[in-house]
Amino acid sequence: MTYEVAIVGASGYTGGELLRVLAVHPDVNVKVVTSREYANKPVYYAHPHLRGIYPASLKFKRLDDPDQLSDVVGDVDLVFLALPHKVSLHYVPKALEVGYKVVDLSADYRLKRVEDYKTWYGYEHPYPDLLEKAVYGLPELYGDKIRGAQLVANPGCNATSSILAVLPPAAERIIDLDRIVVDVKVGSSEAGAKPYRGGHHPEREGTARPYDAEGHRHVAELEQVIRDYTGRDVKVGFTPHAVSMIRGSLASAYSWLTKDLAPLDVQRIYAKYYAGKKFVKIVRGAPMPYPDVKNVYGSNYAEVGFALDKRVGRLAMFAAIDNLMKGAAGTAVQNMNLMLGMDEDEGLKNLVPVRP
């Protein structure tokens, strides 16, 4: 069976990655793509690397308003919303009303608490009922719920790397939940296709700088997942850094052990949570003892690892992902697969990492 999908907001980096991945998916056809900037132009006008991959007849359609959604998109099985935050907000209820399954790649439905949107995004969420309905789309932790979902909220890239690193030790309470600090190094593609000072790659090349050091909004997702698994509220110190790579999100997290453990004990905890998870690799030992974004470049894989600093009783936790893949489009396709009843690695398993 071939499923048909639409990508609403397909001209950005995430839209381009969705198109790249879905081009090799054996059971999915991209029927509709939308973009106001590139309306009526073939997809390769926005994504030149896809010239000859998609037919010239697949052209961007213009979509200006949620009320136009069904007329523009037509009959499809699932819609990817790759729209900016606050724009996607009003497309989701319309898409659900029409009957589409939805993977929303914005932040508009990731958080369960209405008050968190006021705190982190500065607006009152108008659809609290849909926040309850939305499933947080990290398949490694919420796969069973995603399978039956109509609306999946794709996680943020820095949230994904941080959660994969921190969640197993936090859930098992082997670390002090009141003293967790996360440091993320992220590539310039996280800033999106439209350049601005600070996000534009020439401004980031050859340097590294912190930003949102008093609290990046992705930390709300990490705190929410820890709360789901431990039953208690936590506050995590979180600082991302803009670095000169283009792709990649490397989370380095730190906390203090609550019990005396050996490295093998910690490794078993990670294995407990990620055994059988097709896209998570636990990294230990030679030749590279810790996660490296270069090892997951262009793929949906995540590398996860740790270091146990016995001298001070500290656990360092690491995860490396490609921010455009496992941090966005790759996980979105993984979610789509689960929602449509396919194997979760379909269309993704053959996208092996690119190196060097």
Curated annotation (Swiss-Prot):
Residue sites binding NADP(+) per the record: S11, G12, Y13, T14, N323
Subcellular location: Cytoplasm
Record's keyword annotation contains NADP: yes
Keywords: Amino-acid biosynthesis, Arginine biosynthesis, Cytoplasm, Lysine biosynthesis, NADP, Oxidoreductase
Gene Ontology molecular functions: N-acetyl-gamma-aminoadipyl-phosphate reductase activity; N-acetyl-gamma-glutamyl-phosphate reductase activity; NAD binding; NADP+ binding
Reactions that this protein is recorded to catalyse: [amino-group carrier protein]-C-terminal-N-(1-carboxy-5-oxopentan-1-yl)-L-glutamine + phosphate + NADP(+) = [amino-group carrier protein]-C-terminal-N-(1-carboxy-5-phosphooxy-5-oxopentan-1-yl)-L-glutamine + NADPH + H(+); [amino-group carrier protein]-C-terminal-gamma-(L-glutamyl-5-semialdehyde)-L-glutamate + phosphate + NADP(+) = [amino-group carrier protein]-C-terminal-gamma-(5-phospho-L-glutamyl)-L-glutamate + NADPH + H(+)
Cross-referenced Pfam families: Semialdhyde_dh (PF01118), Semialdhyde_dhC_1 (PF22698)
Organism superkingdom: Archaea
Pathway(s) where this gene product acts: Amino-acid biosynthesis; L-lysine biosynthesis via AAA pathway; L-lysine from L-alpha-aminoadipate (Thermus route): step 3/5; Amino-acid biosynthesis; L-arginine biosynthesis
Known function: Involved in both the arginine and lysine biosynthetic pathways.
NCBIfam families: argC
UniProt-recorded name of the protein: Putative [LysW]-L-2-aminoadipate/[LysW]-L-glutamate phosphate reductase
Protein's organism: Ignicoccus hospitalis (strain KIN4/I / DSM 18386 / JCM 14125)
Taxonomic classification: Archaea, Thermoproteota, Thermoprotei, Desulfurococcales, Desulfurococcaceae
